């Protein structure tokens, strides 16, 4: 079901969407991260898939810019309510392009 939020996995799309989750507890996780990165990038190229913000997120701010049509509005809202970036961290700055 589509929603009208700015950066959710379903925002701005009218098609059905599906979630596929992978998890491992095996250490080290290098091979898992390699597979997850391959899948994330392949799904992006093939289907414009959006990765869950709280999972392994290998995509770049360039991917985010292409996937989320309201990302500029989201950045504007963040800058207006958090002008000093107090609630940002390196993930947010890197992935959202602050």
What is each stretch, according to the model?
Residues 63-70, 98:
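Short amphipathic alpha-helical patches
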Residues 1-59, 63-66:
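Substrate-recognition/cap regions that form aromatic- and gly/pro-loop-enriched pockets
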Residues 74-98:
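Intrinsic disorder at enzyme termini
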Residues 18-22, 70, 74, 80:
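C-terminal, helix-dominated tail/subdomain
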């Amino acid at each position: 079901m589509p929603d009208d939020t700015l950066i959710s996995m379903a925002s701005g799309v009218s098609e059905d969407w599906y979630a596929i989750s992978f998890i491992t507890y095996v250490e080290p996780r290098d091979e898992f991260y390699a597979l997850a990165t391959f899948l994330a990038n392949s799904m992006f190229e093939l289907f414009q898939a959006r990765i869950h913000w709280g999972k392994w997120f290998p995509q770049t701010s360039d991917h985010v810019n292409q996937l989320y049509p309201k990302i500029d509005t989201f950045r504007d809202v963040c800058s207006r309510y958090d002008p000093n970036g107090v609630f940002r961290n390196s993930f947010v700055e890197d992935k959202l392009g602050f």
